[in-house]
């Protein structure tokens, strides 16, 4: 049964996050998805980002809406970008263009430890209606909503 890793801060659960999470569950099939959620410590007290527990609750609510059985996933605290993927056995890692370099680093570390590389599943950015990627930063700035719909005219 496949063991799939996906990770992020998940400040605002937007359509890009949804695509990553959905892809992870699709690949896992009868296996299990391990969702690494960035710890407060790793964020180095970035006050614009909600605390770990609030982000975890929102993530749990989102997965519950997907009607995924609790035994099919586990949310783990990420205290570093690689999390448990360098030590534990995983089959896949699902990444965005932003996190792809971390997956390459993980595989280099795994190789040095004599472990099999993870199969990297690359998921493209989800674009907002203006043709640029949906991101939590853009949502926080009030440019777009979680689905990429423009909220106001950008300042030129």
UniProtKB/Swiss-Prot annotation:
Transmembrane segments: none annotated. Keywords: ATP-binding, Coenzyme A biosynthesis, Cytoplasm, Nucleotide-binding, Nucleotidyltransferase, Transferase. It catalyses: (R)-4'-phosphopantetheine + ATP + H(+) = 3'-dephospho-CoA + diphosphate. Pathway: Cofactor biosynthesis; coenzyme A biosynthesis. It is found in: Cytoplasm. It comes from the Archaea. GO terms for biological process: coenzyme A biosynthetic process. CDD domains: PPAT_CoAS. Gene3D superfamilies: HUPs. Reversibly transfers an adenylyl group from ATP to 4'-phosphopantetheine, yielding dephospho-CoA (dPCoA) and pyrophosphate. Belongs to the eukaryotic CoaD family. This is Phosphopantetheine adenylyltransferase. The gene is coaD.
């Amino acid at each position: 049964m496949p063991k799939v890793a996906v990770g992020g801060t998940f400040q605002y659960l937007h359509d890009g996050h949804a695509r990553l999470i959905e892809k992870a569950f699709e690949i896992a099939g009868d296996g299990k998805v391990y969702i690494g959620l960035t710890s407060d410590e790793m964020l180095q007290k970035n006050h614009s980002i909600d605390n770990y527990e609030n982000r975890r609750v929102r993530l749990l609510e989102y997965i519950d809406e997907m009607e995924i059985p609790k035994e099919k996933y586990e949310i783990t605290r990420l205290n570093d970008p690689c999390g448990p993927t360098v030590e534990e056995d995983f089959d896949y890692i699902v990444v965005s263009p932003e996190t792809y370099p971390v997956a390459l680093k993980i595989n280099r570390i795994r190789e040095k430890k004599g472990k099999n590389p993870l199969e990297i599943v690359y998921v493209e950015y989800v674009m907002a209606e203006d043709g640029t990627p949906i991101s939590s930063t853009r949502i926080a700035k009030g440019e777009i909503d979680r689905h990429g719909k423009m909220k106001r005219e950008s300042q030129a």
